[in-house]
Structure formats: structure tokens, C-alpha cells
């Protein structure tokens, strides 16, 4: 059955076939019989990787990507648990570069974060990464320098287990989801700083107002619009960067390129999903197939059968499916419903299955943001929040690509000051029976914090915005349970609470209202077990990643649930996890939305004796 797609999407698909060999530096990618490029695979213990520019044509316009070994994505690396791997990374760019091995436990000087782990790889230079592989599962790797991840410096990573895995399968495919823009990422960032909702082409219309009046009444609808206007936010702004500029790729291919993964009817097929995008959350389903989730972030979980799952930026999920028909669509729609990545599982090349329409666009509500129970008619005071010009912008070298030089996290730019007394207009008496969330003093009177969650909750059993009550079984964090008990076993000796903060209009992001350059490192004592509590004081969803150590997610009662390397934090959520400080050194800790990290949602963690 043929799918329906727009002409624009079709052109993108055809244009993606024009990926070139590139500047004499690269071999041409291999192509399957259908015209779909195959992932290059490198395995063993010795690897040579080269990062350089590569001309591409994904949307009908010629652009320059940065690529690893001439591929977009880079080669699939296959390691074996227990081996020592050596990776020689050569920089053929005109700028410094780096490779970070996401979720991999290794020495700090092998972690690949310029300014913390090492100095970076200068143009023409070579850096040799060497470390023992201590884990197994599905991971990925990417640049931690500037915006290089956005323009192609990333690739998938699979580590074969030393011991038998707790499930059986017959064959497998790696499915890496990414987002591509023809814009210069520096220009894109400038645009967000000038107008943070520039890429939101789905603002509410007069027609929406009329419909809301019919559903909710005049007074409630006017109060709702007034409240959002005073907060200088938009309930349709689920993603800072949308399909207005992004083309969503599956294994480097636009939707109409029809990436195809072959299977034999009746076999058990393992799919290793990786979200390697810069900014995009994806909701994944395969119409006609149940997915049995068996691993999250490379770690085995008790099997759970679902129809759909949301994958945060930087997360990985392994699922097993048992296809019997000739063809199925792998459908990954963006969380804001502005586009999708798509591929096909089929018994032979050239087949397609029906592509479902995008789901309705969700809206963020006050309840979503942890504001449940507020008298929203009394929020006039929120208009007092300082939404003036961002003085810190001038420190970013006019966004000339070196706002965080090569992501040198010892030199990130500054923003300071806050005005937060404006929350006085809220009717806190309307929140009787709720536990009011406290907030750090650094958020008060801070012009770079535009909201605070009043009653955040863990939301572990919440499918998320746009996925509730959709008639499908959707994976939640409450469904995830590691196949092992808490590997440490100790109760945390202390708790560290951090708030995810930001200002939508100014496109400013931070922890506790303090940008990275103004923040002191978080100090952990070597060997201690700590509990980290995160509170999301923004209307955005943030994937939070700690380098070098595992994040052991807890339930609301403080019981160990699942081991992760990236913790998804929806709006209005409060989640806790345990960390064993077993890795001496300096480590990055940040939001994995690239432009949020670039704008300051980043901290250094130091593990000291």
C-alpha cells in the first residue's frame, strides 16, 4: 500500500539520495538495492575515525555537513564487553572537535568534553581514546564541540554482552533518529535569542478561540488567553525548533527515502532505537506490531509490551517485534507534531506500508507545568516578571560560533540577575491540600526565570503530552524496571536538589537560575551515594545527562526502579535518582537539548577524594 506524503516531503526524500562522496576525503557510502544507504559498520578493538566536512543535499539545497568517516550518521561501532578498545580520532576540520561516548563508563580523560575532560582535538590533530569496555547494550557517540552534533558528528554504538542476554531474538536493526536543518546552527541560535517562538508555526488562531469559547465558555477562554499572554508563553510551544526548519531523519534518510530493514516472517526482530537528535523528542510506533521493550539506555529491563514509546533526546530503547505481514511502517513523529521520521520493515526491498497521519497537536496546560489548583484568573502579577533584553547575550561574541568555544566548558558565557517576585498574584489559597514546592533563593528576583512549578510531581506513570488517552498502550517510566536490584544497595547519605530553570521569551536556560559560567561545581566525595532531586520549573521538557556515572531512577517512595544515563524531565515534574560517585575527576552534567546546553543549562560535577 502506498503512503501519502506532501510534495515537500517527497522532494526532501529524493534530495537525500544526493549525498555526495565529499571533497576527496571520503569513500562513497554503500547503497542497498532499494537505493537506501546502509550504515557502515566497524567492529573489533582498533578503530580509525576521521571527522571532516561533507557536501550534502537533503532538502533540495546543497549544504555542508560535518561527518565521521564520510557517513551521516557515522559508522556503527560494535564493541565487546570486557575488551579494551583503541579509537584514533583525526580532525580534518578547520575548528577543534571532540567525540563523547554517550553513557559509557570510562576514565575522565576519555570522556571527550573540551574544557573538562581534555583540551579537544585541534585542526589536523589526532586524539587516541583507549579504555576498557565495562558494559553492554545500545549507545551512541557524538561531538561535544560547538554545534557539530547538529550538523552530523554522531553515530550509533552497540556493545555485545559477555554473558547471555535475558531474551532471545533472531536478527536486529539499529534505528538512529536525528534532526537536520539547512540553516547554520549559529544563525538558528541567533534567531531563537531574538524570537524564541520563531519556529512555532502552530500558534492558536481565531478559530481555536471560537472553539474554546464553545467548549469552555467566554470567561474561561478569555482568562486562559490573558494568563498565557501575561506569562509571555505559548501553550503550543512544545519544541523550540520544529519541522519548520527540521527534516527528521531515520538512519540519515528523509521520510521518502524509505529506509528498509529486512526480516523473515515469524522471526523475533530486535530494534535498537537511538535518539541522536539535537532538539527533537520522538514518539515511536509500528502500526500493526506490538513492541516488547527489553532495554533502556543500554540496561536490561523486565519485558513490557507497548504500542508506542516516547524517546527523549539522547535516550536509547531496545525492543523486540515479531512481524508476520510483508511490510510495516516505523513511524517516529516529533513530539510537537510538526513532522516525522519514517522507515519500513519488510520481507524484501521496495515494499512500503501505510504511513499514519500525524496525531493532533497537544497543548501545554497549567496542570502540566505543576500549577494545578491555581486561581489562574489572579495571575496578573506574573506580568511583572522582567522580560527585558538579555544583557548576557553580548558576551557570546555575537553568536559567532564561539559562544562556548569548542564547547570548552571552562569558558561558557554568562547571564545574571532575576526578578521573580511577580508570582504574588497567584491565589495560593486555592492550592489547599497540595504540598507547595520550595525554590532556591537564586531563583528569586531573577529576570531569567519566568516561572516556578508550585506542585510538581514525579509523573512516572504519565505517558506525556499528546500521548494520554490515545487508545494505544504507551510506555511510561513507571513501566521500566531493571532486571537487577540496586547495584549499590546503600541508602543515599545526602540529597542534592536542583531546579531546571529558564525564560522562554529570552531563550535563557540554567540550573537554579544560575548559568554555567556563574555556577560553582557540584562537589561529590569519592565513594559516596547521593540522591539527586530534579524539579522542572519550566514549560519545556528536558533530558538531563550526567557523564561518567549511572543515574538510578527512583519511584515516589524512594525505591530503585531503573538504571539510566539520561533522565527525561517533563514540565512540572519532580524526579529523584541515586548516583554512586565512583569516578574521580571532572564530569559534565547538562540538559541534552543542544541549544539549551549552549545557553547555560550545564554544570560541572567534580568527584574528589
Swiss-Prot record:
Alphabetically ordered keywords of this record: Copper, Metal-binding, Oxidoreductase, Periplasm, Plasmid, Repeat, Signal
Database matches in Gene3D superfamilies: Cupredoxins - blue copper proteins
Binding positions for Cu cation 4 per the UniProt entry: 542, 591, 596, 601
Pfam family, one: Cu-oxidase
Sequence ranges of the Sequence repeats: 367-374, 375-382, 408-415, 419-426, 427-434
Keyword Kinase attributed: no
Gene Ontology terms, MF aspect: copper ion binding; oxidoreductase activity
Region (5 X 8 AA tandem repeats of D-H-X-X-M-X-G-M): 367-434
InterPro entries, sorted: Cu-oxidase-like_N, Cu-oxidase_2nd, Cu-oxidase_C, Cu-oxidase_fam, Cu-R_CopA, Cu_oxidase_CS, Cu_oxidase_Cu_BS, Cupredoxin
Keyword Metal-binding part of the UniProt annotation: yes
Post-translational modification: Predicted to be exported by the Tat system. The position of the signal peptide cleavage has been experimentally proven.
Source organism phylogeny: Bacteria, Pseudomonadati, Pseudomonadota, Gammaproteobacteria, Pseudomonadales
Cited function: Mediates copper resistance by sequestration of copper in the periplasm along with the copper-binding protein CopC. May have oxidase activity.
Compartment(s) of residence: Periplasm
Binding site for Cu cation 2: 102, 142, 592
GO cellular component: periplasmic space
Annotated gene: copA
Binding positions for Cu cation 1 per the UniProt entry: 100, 545
Residues binding Cu cation 3: 144, 547, 590
Family designation: Belongs to the multicopper oxidase family. CopA subfamily.
Stretch forming the signal peptide: 1-32
Species: Pseudomonas syringae pv. tomato
Induction info: By copper.
The name this protein goes by in its record: Copper resistance protein A
